[in-house]
Structures are given as structure tokens and as C-alpha cells.
Amino acid sequence: MALREIIIIPDKQLRLISKPVETVSAEVRRLADDMFETMYEAPGIGLAAIQVAQPVRLITMDLVRKEGNSLTEPRAFINPEVISASEEMNVYEEGCLSIPEYYAEVERPKQVRIRYTDLDGNVKEEDADGLFATCIQHEIDHLNGVLFVDHISKLKRAMVMRKFEKAAKRGIKYV
């Protein structure tokens, strides 16, 4: 396992649409292991492969230590997709390892049904609610080039982007 560098806004790679994983290979499993190690070191509860500059549809997540979640163990999700969502919404304060030290309330569907492939190559469907639903939607957004700040007001988003663009120009790195 190896730590990987987490890319930070305004890095344009974060806006890429990640490509599907064709086969669950040793390379994909190694990437997942690296992502878990990187996520724990950061520390965070979820990480999309694009955040470590790998534009493939892979997410790692561990909500075990968080209250209000239905995910009971660390998990990797390959080619995840939301196949249905509740009309009822939930608001959670979200943060992101690619947008350090910034948090905002985001409204998302309270429950979602997801389809994904696990690290053994099995295609699964599962219901997610609470923090699990919020986190999986946040990470799937990353795979589609969408950041959580895209769900907040234009004014707040512009302020956040400006702050990170100025920091990048001055060579300030957030870690």
C-alpha cells in the first residue's frame, strides 16, 4: 500500500468524468488499498479515485466511526451508480478532502438505491440512507466531475473557488 497525493481545487482533473472499470484486476485492488490508506491518513470518510488523479470509477468509504450511518464496514465501490432516489431530502454539512477546511450544508435525497461492483467482481444492489446515502452521492458526484460546492449558492461557490485559486497562484498547498 502507498499514500497518494490528494489533488485540491482548482485542479482541473477534479472536473473530469471518470471512466468505467472494465475488470476488477490486481491493479484495481491495489488502487483501492492505496485509496483506503490515503483516506485514513487524511483523515476522511470517503475518497473517489479521481481525487488521487486516477480517472476511474472507484470509491472507497468507511463510515464505521460515524453516527447515523448504515454502512458497517470499510467498503470499495466499483462503477457505482444511483438507480433510484427518494423524493424526501436530507441536509448534511459536507466537506471534501479536495476542498480542505471548507464545509457547507448540502441537500440531497435522503435514500438512494445503488448498483456497483465489489472488489470480488460481484455486481450488487443496495439501499443507502442517512450518512451512507449522502456520502455515496457525494463520491459518485466526484466520478462525474461534480463537487459538493456545485450544490451551494453561486455566490458561496465563487468565494470558495476564488480563495483556492488565489492560494494556488501563491503556491500555497493545503494538506
From Swiss-Prot:
Protein name as it appears in the record: Peptide deformylase
Recite the UniProt cofactor note for this protein.
Answer: Binds 1 Fe(2+) ion.
Gene transcribed to yield this protein: def
Against CDD domains, the record matches this protein to: Pep_deformylase (cd00487)
Q: Which Pfam families match?
A: Pep_deformylase (PF01327)
- Catalytic residues, chain numbering: E139
List the cofactors.
Answer: Fe(2+)
Sites binding Fe cation sit at: C96, H138, H142
- What's a Gene Ontology MF term here? metal ion binding
User: What is the annotated role of this protein in its UniProt record?
Assistant: Removes the formyl group from the N-terminal Met of newly synthesized proteins. Requires at least a dipeptide for an efficient rate of reaction. N-terminal L-methionine is a prerequisite for activity but the enzyme has broad specificity at other positions.
Instruction: Return the similarity comment.
Output: Belongs to the polypeptide deformylase family.
EC primary class: hydrolase
